[in-house]
A protein has these predicted regions:
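Internal alpha-helical scaffold of NAD(P)-dependent oxidoreductase catalytic cores
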Residues: 49-56, 121, 138-230, 292
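Short, hydrophobic beta-strand segments that form beta-sheet elements in well-ordered domains
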Residues: 40-44, 101-103, 150
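Rossmann-like NAD(P)(H) cofactor-binding subdomain of soluble oxidoreductases
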Residues: 60-138
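Short coil/turn segments
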Residues: 21, 106-107, 130, 152-155
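NAD(P)+-binding Rossmann beta1-loop-alpha1 motif at the extreme N-terminus of oxidoreductases
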Residues: 8-67
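Short, well-ordered alpha-helices that flank and scaffold nucleotide-derived cofactor binding pockets
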Residues: 26, 30-34, 55, 89-93, ...
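Interdomain hinge/lid region at the active-site interface
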Residues: 227-283, 295
Length: 295
């Protein structure tokens, strides 16, 4: 219990420095400041970006890497994925004893990003918000809804989690070996869905819609479906011809598509059948599987 209170006390008094003044760095810094966490300031190789971020978050512009490292207990390296280790290599010979070094990459583990960190007496963490940070100056408003996934040194993991628990965020730990698969899951849900919607829009345009009117027409079913999935899960949200094992309609769909579109339709329908079988254990999907080339 005393250890918990010590950890909680350390979180409250933690001084956090942000290296990299892009969308994620700006959003995190603003979010921390609004919740009365101590942000030492911003450092970026592009001084103008760091100055803008410091002004926006009402913190301090810091001129050099050594200073921000020296005055911070925790450092967030919010730079592009391929630069994280580059920045780390510039820091690792500084005095890092007892400091927490964090990055926000979804795919990189702390060990991959910060090679040799254990020899420096510092502790490495990947802290990934499951959230699309798309707007440098507005995304912070939505960060309270984000789910943070943390991976790294178990010794002080609770303190890193405590930062976000104290802000009301949900937090989950993940093993380093699962980082890439976890990131792939997030990408499918966030990015690949966009590709499917584009496919749908393209088909609508072949029927005479322009993209704007197609999007307006499809928005209610897209948004409604996402809401249902979020609230009730995929099994309870699935409807449509594949779920009903409506062979005739599926055949017609396949006939109106080109070869590439058919391939996508077939692959996705396989997944829909597996969901349909959970929803309707007594329904026979045999003929449908045959038509889709599954059997």
């Amino acid at each position: 219990d005393s250890e918990y209170h010590h950890a909680k006390g350390r979180v409250i008094n933690m001084r956090t420095g942000i290296i990299g003044a892009g969308k994620v760095g700006c959003s995190l810094g603003k979010y921390f400041r609004l919740n009365n966490l101590k942000v030492t300031g911003y450092y970026d190789v592009n001084e103008n970006l760091a100055k803008e971020a410091a002004t926006f978050t009402e913190t301090t512009f810091i001129e050099d890497l050594e200073t921000i490292v020296k005055i911070s207990d925790t450092l967030f390296l919010t730079v592009p994925d391929d630069l994280i280790t580059t920045v780390w290599n510039q820091m690792k010979d500084m005095s890092l004893e007892g400091k927490f070094i964090c990055h926000c990459s979804g795919a990189l583990s702390a060990g991959d990003a910060f090679p040799g960190i254990d020899k420096c007496g510092a502790f490495g963490y990947s802290v990934h918000p499951l959230f699309a940070v798309s707007d440098k100056y507005n995304s912070y408003k939505e960060l309270s809804h984000a789910y943070f996934v943390i991976e790294g040194d178990e010794k002080h993991r609770e303190e890193i989690a405590g930062i976000f628990n104290n802000l009301g965020n949900e937090v989950r730990y993940i093993a380093a070996k699962d980082k890439v698969k976890y990131h792939c899951a997030a990408a499918v849900c966030s990015n690949h869905v966009v590709a499917l919607i584009q496919e749908s829009l393209d088909l609508m345009q072949e029927c005479g819609f322009d993209e704007e009117s197609a999007l307006k027409a499809l928005a209610p079913i897209m948004l409604g479906n996402m809401q249902h999935i979020a609230e009730r899960g995929t099994v309870n949200s699935l409807t449509g011809p594949v779920e009903r094992a409506d062979v005739k309609t599926v055949e017609k769909h396949l006939n109106c598509l080109d070869e590439k579109q058919q391939m996508l339709y077939r692959l996705l329908s396989e997944v829909l059948i597996s969901i349909g079988e959970k929803k309707n254990p007594g329904r026979d999907y045999g003929r449908l599987k045959h038509i889709l080339g599954n059997e």
